[in-house]
Amino acid sequence: MGSRCLFCFADGFKGQRFKWARANNRSGAVLALEAASLLGDRVTKLYLYEPPFIINDSRKPVPADYVQQLNSLTEAGKRSEAVEYFVSEALGIPDEFIGYMKADPSWNKMKDLSHTLAYDGLIMGTTQSGKPLPTNRWVVNAPTLIMTGENSEPLFHDAAQALVKLLPKAAIHTLGGQDHSAVITAPEVLAKTVVDFEL
């Protein structure tokens, strides 16, 4: 979703106020940041789970031509290859595990949706380039809680630390015993945090 489309969407909610609870393993957190920037003070609180920013050498950055390569594979009808490229380059899954993923029935479902993977890349923009986050992309004054899992990879903790420095009313809360899959494996833990944690 481009910024123009997102602005039209956000503009449709004039006069309404929101407490946004957005937990997502990929671009959903960034999309929530974009929406909160556009909606301004109509967003009263914002909750994010592990925005997957790559801002240093904690893992290999996503290639600069990532979106272009995804589109090329999809347009050529190479849907499985597009999913494999996404899993390898964006998610950072080692090659030795991808074969097991292909054997799972969910791989075919991912193939059916492979044409949408480029949208994810467009939303992420340069936030996975291995460079510092842009300082002027988001203007969010709402109290923001950035959640991380205790057992998650360092990149997610580094990303949270970088983002909390950019948002004036942001805080970090680490969920004990959780990792990046908590959105799927422990949604009740995230929900309780959203309900209980006062910003």
Regions found by a protein language model. Give the residues of each.
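Conserved serine/cysteine hydrolase catalytic core
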Residues: S106-L166, A171-G177, A182
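Short, well-ordered alpha-helices that flank and scaffold nucleotide-derived cofactor binding pockets
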Residues: E34-D41, K165, K192, D196
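Alpha-helical elements of Rossmann-like donor-binding domains used by nucleotide-donor carbohydrate transfer enzymes
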Residues: C5-D11, Q69, E81, Y85, ...
